[in-house]
Regions:
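N-terminal/domain-start alpha-helical segments
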Residues: 1-87
């Protein structure tokens, strides 16, 4: 199973990749939505772990562009937001 991790915080990006790799997944990593679009043009993924708040393009905008282009890859969102207004 091939997973794309899209997370701008370098330590969390590295930890996610290391953990998923240790579980036997093939993992690619990138740091924002714009970079993720480049990865998605060149490869197919079974799942995407996607941060909500990122520079250049946030996770919601990336997901919207993916769906508009017909990409139905399952997405797992990550966020540090925890208050009701943030939801």
């Amino acid at each position: 199973m091939r997973i794309l991790v899209v997370e701008d915080e370098q330590d969390l990006n590295r930890i996610l990749a290391k953990t998923l790799t240790a579980e036997g997944y093939s993992v690619d990593t990138c740091f924002d939505g714009v970079e993720a679009l480049d990865y998605l043009e060149g490869a197919e993924y079974d799942a995407i772990v996607l941060d909500v708040m990122m520079p250049r393009m946030d996770g919601f905008s990336l997901l919207a562009q993916m769906r508009e282009s017909g990409n139905e890859t399952p997405v797992i969102f990550l966020t540090a937001k925890d208050s009701v207004p943030d939801r």
